[in-house]
Amino acid sequence: MFSEIIKKYDIVTLKDSGFLRGDWFIGSALMAHDYESLKEGIYFYPQETIWTRILDLEYINPYWEIYNQTYNFLLVNKQDSLAMNFLTSLLREIEVISSKTLDFVVITSNEHLIRNLIDRDYYIITKEIPFFIENSKVGNYFKIFVKNGGQFIPIIDCTEFKIQSKKYFEININKFYLKLLDYFLHGEIPEKFKFFGNTSNFNIESLFLEFIDSQENIRVVSLLDCLIQLSSKNIEISGNYKGHTVKKILKKFALYSVITKLDITKVNH
């Protein structure tokens, strides 16, 4: 995926460093690399993260997940015009992948981006979403959705920021968001929900929309998916941060297994 864009823009590919860093989990793709040491250019890297901040959210949506896989692009000290052209190239590529012309909705306060995208017939919502590093505002987020009937499906998160006179433009594309987009467009159910259906003997194929209408169902599937990934790295309960996090996830999984009546004895990962 994105191989033609990577070639066209002479993009440097960085290694996926996994979701572990010592005794901590990597919670955002930006944490995975020393971005301040990168030279001017465009970089691409796939990245796994464990996003523990959302564990205690009271209200969630179908896109809620703890373990994430993302495609990431980072533009360092590139002109706004190149960044905007690059972003629209990515949106066109997503349309090719989806085999459909998509209605994009962009939430941003970037005036250059607004002028650029209005000409391309994208729908713009003007709103500032500040981005902070260590409690200091260094830039802004903006978000891109696909409008599909009455649904708004998140597809890309972007961050623009400056640190020590260097300008960064980060683009995150969550693989799970693409899979849910594929479901809403073509009916293909994401793999982690299929696995849950097989594990719990639930006919998820015919009841998927009803299933994801329940926050409890979404929680238990994503908790299970995260535990499977942690198990693959042999991460267990212990006295450090990672071990405490595993314990917390296990307790929540047990709780929502009871609520959703999942027989956890059938889970063999």
Where does each model-flagged region fall?
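Class II aminoacyl-tRNA synthetase-like tRNA-binding/catalytic domains
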Residues: 1-78, 119-173, 191
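Non-catalytic, well-ordered alpha-helical scaffold segments
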Residues: 44, 48, 65-69, 85, ...
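Active/ligand-binding-proximal structured segments within catalytic/core domains
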Residues: 68, 168-200
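Conserved, charged catalytic cores of large soluble enzymes
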Residues: 81-125
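Extended, well-ordered alpha-helical scaffold/bundle regions in very large, multi-domain proteins
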Residues: 100-102, 237-245, 256-269
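Non-transmembrane, aqueous-exposed alpha-helical and coiled segments at domain scale
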Residues: 159-162, 220-223, 228-233, 243, ...
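Structural motif
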Residues: 167-172, 216-219, 236-245
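A structural-propensity feature for long, helix-poor, extended segments
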Residues: 203-237
